[in-house]
């Protein structure tokens, strides 16, 4: 449930120029408008399940896009039942100015993208529901300038080709392979989003080794019975999942309105210290492993923060 300080479920992932919205609760479009992201650049929405606190923002957003004259297609992915659910809202939304594409997916499906893939997995919530993993492709190793100099690889296109994993032939006829000048391959980043769920082996398997696991902690441990009755999990259970999955950072969301956040974070950190409970408009930066660890940027997506950064820049 929303509170005066916290909006319900919606998470935006930005990777390069891609903006991926996971779930869209009531008020999501207003939150986006208040952020540094905005609405019109959204191209894809990924739904975890169809409970009202995860999808009620979709009809209003569809209508707003149309009123703004959007022409760019919008794709919405979700579990089985997506087409029936959103198709039934045509009378509410009215005529659209763009192509709305509804795509149903099953646990185990994979959507390939440029440089990464989105893999779905089953979660335990008592309804048709799934989680999402964003998994980047392995990257070439670091370019060894000294090795390239020793081999006589000239500066320019040849070095660029080797960095892209391509073989090159030098002017004297010698062939140079990428592995001659590149270090070991470097893993990409991995982000896992569960949506609402009870703890399960499937989540541990899907989240194994992830840089970031975003999962729910609807209840504190004292309410474990309530969590089990409603197919949710406690902060303690979420921390145990993160520990078993060997993730880098645990991000807890979907708190009951009886909690403010710090008490949930404290409970989880007793088991898994690398835990945060972000607020609206907070950002979790996920650098490549060689550049650091995932970390919280408070208010990093707020338009106010963006304006402050611009106004403080040297003129």
Task: Please identify what each model-predicted range represents.
Residues 12, 106-252, 259-271, 287-314:
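Metal-dependent phosphodiesterase/nuclease catalytic metal-binding core
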Residues 22-25, 42-50, 79, 192-197, ...:
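Active-site neighborhood of phospho(di)ester-bond hydrolases with catalytic His/Asp-centered motifs
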Residues 16, 41-42, 68-73, 244-251:
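Short, surface-exposed connector motifs at secondary-structure boundaries
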């Amino acid at each position: 449930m929303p509170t005066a300080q916290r909006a319900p479920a919606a998470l935006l992932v930005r990777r390069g120029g891609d903006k991926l919205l996971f779930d869209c609760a009531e008020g999501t479009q207003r939150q986006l408008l208040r952020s540094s992201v905005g609405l019109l650049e959204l191209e894809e929405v990924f739904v975890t399940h169809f409970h009202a606190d995860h999808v009620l923002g979709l009809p209003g957003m569809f209508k707003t896009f149309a009123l703004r004259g959007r022409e760019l297609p919008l794709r919405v992915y979700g579990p089985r039942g997506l087409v029936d659910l959103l198709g039934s809202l045509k009378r509410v939304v009215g005529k659209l100015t763009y192509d709305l594409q509804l795509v149903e997916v099953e646990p185990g499906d994979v959507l390939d993208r440029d440089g990464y893939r989105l893999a779905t997995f089953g979660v335990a919530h008592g309804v048709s529901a799934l989680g999402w993993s964003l998994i980047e492709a392995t990257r070439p190793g670091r370019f060894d300038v000294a090795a390239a100099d020793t081999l006589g690889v000239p500066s320019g296109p040849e070095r660029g080709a080797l960095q892209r994993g391509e073989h090159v032939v030098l002017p004297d006829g010698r062939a140079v392979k990428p592995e001659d000048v590149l270090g070991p391959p470097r893993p990409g980043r991995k982000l896992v989003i569960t949506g609402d769920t009870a703890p399960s082996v499937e989540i541990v398997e899907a989240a194994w080794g992830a840089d970031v696991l975003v999962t729910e902690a609807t209840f504190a441990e004292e309410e474990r019975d309530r969590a089990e009755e409603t197919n949710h999990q406690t902060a303690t259970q979420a921390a145990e999942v993160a520990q078993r999955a060997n993730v880098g950072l645990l991000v807890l969301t979907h708190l009951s309105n009886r909690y403010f956040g710090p008490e949930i974070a404290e409970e989880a950190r007793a088991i898994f210290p690398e835990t945060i409970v972000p607020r609206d408009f907070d950002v979790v930066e996920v650098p490549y492993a060689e550049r650091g660890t995932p970390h919280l940027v408070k208010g990093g997506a707020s338009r106010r923060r963006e304006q402050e950064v611009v106004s403080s820049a040297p003129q």
